[in-house]
Amino acid sequence: MTCINLPARTGQQFSISHGDYEAVITELGATMRKLTYKGEDLTVALGPDDLVTCCHGQILIPFPNRIEGGEYTFEGKTYSLPIDEHDRNTAIHGYGYRSFWKLISLAEDAVTLAWRSPNMVGYPFDLYVTATYSLADDGMHLTVSAYNNGDTNAPWALAIHPWLANSLNGYGDEIDEHNAKCSLTLPARTHVTVDENLIPTGTEPVDGTKYDLREDTLLTEQPFDDAWTDLEHAEDGSVTAVFTRADGKKVRVGGDETITSFQVCTGTKFPAFQHPA
C-alpha cells in the first residue's frame, strides 16, 4: 500500500500567538482547537485528528440552537432542514461547522477564514461569512461578518461554542463535582425556558431563582444547559460574563452591543469521550 501524506482530519492548522497567548485555528469549521495562556489551556484542547464533539470551539451559522422538526418559516415561506439530532427531532447549530473554510489571510497574531453557504435543501440563501481570530494583550478577539449575496432577504444568526477548561480536566461523572468548585457571573435579567427537547418556549425573570447569576455564583445548582437574554450591557455597549475556574483564574467571555444572549452548558451526564470540561 502506498503511503499518502494526509492532512489532519480537521484540515490545515493555523497557529497564532501574541505575548503569553497561543491559539490554533483549524480549516474545518474555523474551529478554535486550542487556546492557551502561559502554556495552560483556557479551553478544552483537541488534537488535530480528534473527533470534534459538541461543536467545541466552532462557529454556529447560519443558525445556532435547535429548530423543532427542522422546519421554520421565513417571510411567509416554510423551509425544511435535514434532521441531525434524531433523539430530539431537531436541526441543530447550522452547517458552517461541517465545512472546510478558506484561508484569506494569516499573520503572526491573527488569521481570517471564509465560508460560503452551499445551495442546499432547507437553506437556499447565499451567505458569505468571514471570521477573524486575533490575539492581543487581553486575549482572543473574534470578529465575524456576514454578507448576503442573494437578491432576497436571508435568515441569519450566529453563536460561538467554546468549552472553557475548569482547570481540573475531569471526565464524565467527575464534571459536576469539579464545576461545583467554579463560579460564574452572568449579567442577564431573563432566563429562556425550554421543553423536553430543549426548544425555547418563553422567558422568565431570573429574580429569586437559581438562574440569577448577576453576582458571582458557585456552580453548585446544576445542571445547566440554558440560555439567558435581556443582558445588562455597559455604557459602551459591551457585555461580559466571567467564569472563575477551580484554580481561581478568571476567564472573561463577552462582546459588543450585537450580543443578545449567553448560553451555559455544564456538560452534566456527557459521556467521557466528549470531555467538555
Where are the regions that the model predicts?
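Short Pro/Gly-enriched beta-strand edge/turn motifs at strand-loop
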Residues: 50-58, 83-87, 112-118, 222-225
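Extended, loop-rich substrate-binding clefts of extracytoplasmic carbohydrate-active enzymes
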Residues: 3-4, 8, 17, 83-137
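Active-site/ligand-binding surface loops and adjacent short beta/alpha elements
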Residues: 165, 169-258
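Acidic, contiguous internal or C-terminal segments within carbohydrate-active enzymes
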Residues: 16, 23, 117-164, 168-171
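Short solvent-exposed loop/turn micro-motifs enriched in small/polar/acidic residues
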Residues: 6-9, 26-28, 63-65, 94-98, ...
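Active-site pocket scaffolds in enzymes
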Residues: 249-277
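Beta-strand-rich N-terminal accessory domains
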Residues: 1-81, 239-259
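A short, structured loop/turn motif at beta-sheet edges
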Residues: 73-77, 104-111, 134-139, 176, ...
